[in-house]
């Protein structure tokens, strides 16, 4: 019996790529899903300048680069850059030969069919993987929480999904997708900071604002009340030091930015807030499963990491639900990585081993096999 080869699990988010080995309890590599290209031509010979940089290296040289995210709203829009990110993941981050390991990738719910096929094709033809599988992100988050039934609110950098799952099956007719997530909140924070006189405009400066957002923002339990408190005292104000040493103060922006999750109208979007989207999704499900969904609302993704978000969600959903309904919000501390963790669990199950698409099956059937084997 030869030694089991660990599968590689890669969760390609719009903002961050999480990668590692099946069976581990956390991803080994977490880096920004960015490809950067120099804005200026190099004038110094022998500096070893590259024509593109990926991930943290792109981030650290962002002052001289134009940064591009190949995944927008959870869906790959630039395959050349995506290939660079996968190449970087295998060879630089995990330091593995992809032709020796099965590869599990994740995808957004309601991902276009052509995208799944392209993904499959690249993994087999460019990277020569021996086996491949693609799994829906929200379903993996639910696995990670140890459930098979629940409704997952998965909000990352590029897209927010609400996915009801019953006994391990996503209910496709009730899935909702909102193209509003972390990146939009960052942009909104840039906008409201500009009103205060702090101007951030380049792609590099946007990353500073993202850091401010991650460190200082929170969700208010009662927005109107919080606005009033903020206007009357300065106890909600916090300071932040910019890379050049300048210190800026932010006040009500701390909770005004994430409030867009509950009131997308401030971003000029017509969709309802995440609470309304979740409620509508539950209402699209069969009346018999609703109780189980209300009792298992699972949050996942980086944009659910704001302090106060679970309490606010509890309050909003309780107000919408029938009065006798027991509403429970589950917000596991590791939810930033729960999609990856779910993938790690799935790919190491003994029962899963017959689910992989093998290279041989791919060679016989072509990319469309992904629709038959992965659901």
Swiss-Prot record:
Alphabetical list of Gene3D superfamilies matching this protein: 3.30.420.40, Actin, Chain A, domain 4
PROSITE patterns: ACTINS_1, ACTINS_2, ACTINS_ACT_LIKE
Superkingdom in the source lineage: Eukaryota
Keyword Nucleotide-binding: yes
CDD domains for this protein: ASKHA_NBD_actin (cd10224)
GO CC terms: cytoplasm; cytoskeleton
Major localization listed first in the record, in broad terms: cytoplasm
Cell compartment(s), UniProt: Cytoplasm, Cytoskeleton
A GO term, aspect molecular function: hydrolase activity
Catalytic reaction annotation: ATP + H2O = ADP + phosphate + H(+)
Name of a matching Pfam family: Actin
Keywords: ATP-binding, Cytoplasm, Cytoskeleton, Hydrolase, Nucleotide-binding
EC number(s) from the headed UniProt entry: 3.6.4.-
Family statement drawn from the similarity comment of this UniProt entry: Belongs to the actin family.
Protein name in UniProt: Actin
């Amino acid at each position: 019996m030869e030694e089991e080869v660990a599968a590689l699990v890669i969760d390609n988010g719009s903002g961050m790529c999480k990668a590692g080995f099946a069976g581990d309890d956390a991803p080994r590599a977490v880096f920004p899903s960015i490809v950067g290209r120099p804005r200026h031509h190099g004038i110094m010979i022998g500096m070893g300048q590259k024509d593109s940089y990926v991930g943290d290296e792109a981030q650290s040289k962002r002052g001289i680069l134009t940064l591009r995210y190949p995944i927008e709203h959870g869906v790959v829009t630039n395959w050349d850059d995506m290939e660079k990110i996968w190449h970087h993941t295998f060879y630089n981050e995990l330091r593995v030969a992809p032709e020796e390991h099965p590869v599990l990738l994740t995808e957004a719910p309601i991902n276009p069919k052509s995208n799944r096929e392209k993904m499959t094709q690249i993994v087999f033809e460019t990277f020569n993987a021996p086996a491949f599988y693609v799994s829906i992100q929200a379903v993996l988050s639910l696995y990670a929480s140890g459930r098979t039934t629940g409704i997952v609110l998965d909000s990352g950098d590029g897209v927010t999904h609400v996915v009801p799952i019953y006994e391990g099956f996503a209910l496709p007719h009730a899935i909702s997708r909102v193209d509003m997530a972390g990146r939009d909140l960052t942009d909104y924070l840039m906008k409201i900071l500009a009103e205060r006189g702090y101007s951030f405009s380049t792609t590099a400066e946007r990353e500073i604002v993202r850091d401010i957002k991650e460190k200082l923002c929170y969700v208010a339990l009662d927005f109107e009340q919080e606005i009033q408190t903020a206007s009357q005292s300065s106890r909600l104000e916090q300071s932040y030091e910019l890379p050049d040493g300048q210190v800026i103060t932010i006040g009500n922006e701390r909770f005004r930015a994430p409030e867009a999750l509950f009131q997308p109208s401030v971003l000029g979007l017509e969709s309802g807030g995440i609470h309304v989207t979740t409620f509508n999704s539950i209402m699209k499900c069969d009346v018999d499963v609703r109780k189980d969904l209300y009792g298992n609302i699972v949050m996942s993704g980086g944009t659910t990491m704001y302090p106060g978000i679970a309490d606010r969600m509890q309050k909003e959903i309780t107000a919408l639900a029938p009065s006798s309904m027991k509403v429970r919000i589950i917000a596991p501390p590791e939810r930033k990585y729960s999609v990856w963790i779910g993938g790690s669990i799935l790919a190491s199950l003994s029962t899963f081993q017959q689910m992989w698409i093998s290279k041989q099956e791919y060679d016989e059937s072509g990319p469309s096999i992904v629709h038959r084997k992965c659901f």
